[in-house]
């Protein structure tokens, strides 16, 4: 049998039986999707690959907990979202500590976000990164990863109505963040 014809459930059973090639196939099948989700959550940076690897390590270590109640892609995406949220928390803590150190040493804080980069993708990505994690996760899953409302609700363990309202709020916030950019380009 060719690897791409084997179902996810068959791969999981093979992994449980010690087949390392089945695990490699799961990684190959879902790595780009998982990295895209992580990148949408934390931005394009060196940590994306590290967190992506951690997703598959966590999956492997918890393989016996996977009951197949949701698709494997949903399960892996949930792990990716959780690890991304952990990274966001770590960054906020690091930033808070560095700001406290700067203030205690009497240094000046300068605004480094006022760059002159006209790359649309980067501008949009920066705007997405400004969203709070709860809005960003819904936006990334629905609009970037193209999950349905129901799939997004399952991944985030939220009611579908909450997904829809967060998506609407995320889009409003994103529009607010991007409005100055588009106004400057319309002139």
Q: In which residue ranges do the predicted regions lie?
A:
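Short, charged helix-capping/linker segments at alpha-helix termini
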Residues: 1-2, 16-25, 35-54, 160, ...
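C-terminal edge and immediately downstream basic/flexible tail or linker adjoining helix-turn-helix-like DNA-binding
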Residues: 2-5, 14, 43, 96-100, ...
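Internal acidic/polar
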Residues: 4-5, 94-121, 148
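Helix-turn-helix DNA-binding module
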Residues: 9, 129-137, 141-162, 173
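Sigma70-family region 2
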Residues: 16-17, 43-44, 56-71, 91
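Amphipathic, Lys/Arg- and hydrophobic-enriched alpha-helical face
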Residues: 27-45, 62, 128, 177-180
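Structural recognition of an alpha-helix C-terminal capping motif at a helix-to-coil junction
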Residues: 50-57, 70-82
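Arg/Lys-rich amphipathic alpha helix in sigma70-family domain 2
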Residues: 65-68, 78-99
């Amino acid at each position: 049998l060719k690897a791409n014809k084997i179902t996810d459930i068959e791969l999981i059973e093979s992994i449980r039986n010690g087949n390392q090639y089945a695990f490699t196939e799961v990684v190959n099948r879902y790595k780009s999707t998982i990295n895209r989700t992580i990148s949408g959550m934390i931005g394009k940076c060196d940590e994306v690959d590290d967190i992506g690897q951690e997703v598959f390590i966590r999956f492997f270590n918890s393989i016996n907990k996977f009951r197949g109640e949701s698709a494997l892609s949903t399960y892996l995406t949930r792990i990716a979202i959780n690890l991304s949220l952990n990274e966001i928390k770590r960054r906020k803590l690091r930033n808070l500590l560095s700001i406290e150190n700067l203030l205690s040493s009497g240094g000046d804080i300068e605004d480094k976000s006022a760059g002159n980069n006209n790359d649309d993708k980067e501008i949009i990505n920066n705007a997405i990164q400004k969203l709070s994690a709860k809005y960003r996760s819904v936006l990334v899953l629905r609009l970037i990863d193209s999950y349905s409302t129901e799939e997004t609700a399952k991944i985030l363990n939220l009611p579908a109505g909450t997904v829809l309202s967060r998506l609407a709020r995320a889009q409003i916030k994103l529009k607010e963040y991007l409005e100055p950019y588009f106004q400057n380009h319309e002139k």
